[in-house]
A protein has these predicted regions:
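Active-site loop immediately N-terminal to the catalytic Tyr-X3-Lys motif
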Residues: 98-101, 148-154, 176-177, 216, ...
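Alpha-helical segment proximal to the catalytic Tyr-Lys
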Residues: 128, 172-176, 237
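C-terminal helical subdomain
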Residues: 183, 203-235, 239, 246-248
Length: 264
């Protein structure tokens, strides 16, 4: 039985771990050829070898997703290797924990570059190819942190909010060219980012973050990959300009203390 992405070609940035790696594997399982791009060539190669060993098709490239030449090289690799580009998953991002008054301009600019500029570049350079081919799908990783504020993460909040509105603008510009552009907004996901944010209290961070979700746990990378795969497929043919929230119910909450929860 053909997969949802049979014979399509996809690029996944930050594809060497977490959501990116899970999505690269899922894309390949659904029949796509995948270019895995990551700042860590070692991680990108490992995911690629795993896909190829399982009978899929994948290539890898070491890139800084905030570098325009690197994004162009990634797209060139996809076309040279597989002949086309059908799906662009702009997944690169980073967070720095710092209150605004302590955030350096260098730190601010780097978060913007890796999180927002990389998404802009992925759209900018994939759109001409997709227009020439007659269509495609672009999915961007935003976050519930782009919908709400967090303590000490202003640069990340601003960058992810930018990803959401960039998604909308790109969707409007490209709808008539049969290019769908959507973003996914994860809640707390069990990736190595949780380790980084939690530092030496990573396990406590995971427990606290999990308890903050109405479903009682953090999400898994594969659960985001499921949504991204849907958005990349023809099953989402009438969806563009959307932000799809996958957060275990966190954003459904007003912030009111759960004093009435026993009556629910």
């Amino acid at each position: 039985m053909p997969g949802k992405l049979n014979d399509r070609v996809a690029i996944v940035t930050a594809g060497g771990a977490g959501i990116g790696a899970a999505t690269a594997r899922r894309f390949a399982a659904e029949g796509a050829a995948v270019v895995v791009a990551d700042l860590s060539g070692t991680r990108a190669q490992a995911v690629t070898e795993e896909i190829n060993s399982a009978g899929g098709r994948a290539a890898f490239i070491k890139i800084d997703a905030a570098d325009p030449e690197a994004i162009q090289a990634t797209i060139k690799l996809a076309i040279d290797s597989y002949g086309r580009l059908d799906v662009m998953f702009n997944n690169a991002g980073m967070a720095v924990v710092s209150p605004i008054h302590d955030t350096t301009l260098e730190s601010w600019n780097r978060v913007m570059a890796v999180t927002l500029t990389s998404t802009f570049l992925g759209i900018k350079y994939s759109v001409p190819i997709m227009r020439k081919q007659g269509g495609g799908a672009i999915i961007n990783t935003a976050s519930i942190s782009g919908m709400h504020g967090d303590y000490g993460m202003a640069s990340y909040n601003a960058a992810k909010a930018g990803v959401i509105n960039l998604t909308r603008a790109a969707a409007l510009e490209n709808a008539k060219h049969k290019i769908r552009v959507n973003c996914v907004c994860p809640g707390g996901i069990n990736t190595r980012v949780a380790q980084v944010l939690g530092g030496d209290r990573a396990e406590e961070f995971r427990r606290t973050m999990g308890a903050a979700h109405p479903v009682g746990r953090m999400g898994e990378p594969e659960e985001i990959a499921n949504t991204v795969t849907f958005l990349a497929s023809d099953e989402a043919s009438f969806i563009t300009g959307a932000k799809i929230v996958v957060d275990g119910g966190v954003s459904a909450h007003t912030g009111m203390p759960p004093f009435l929860s026993s009556k629910a």
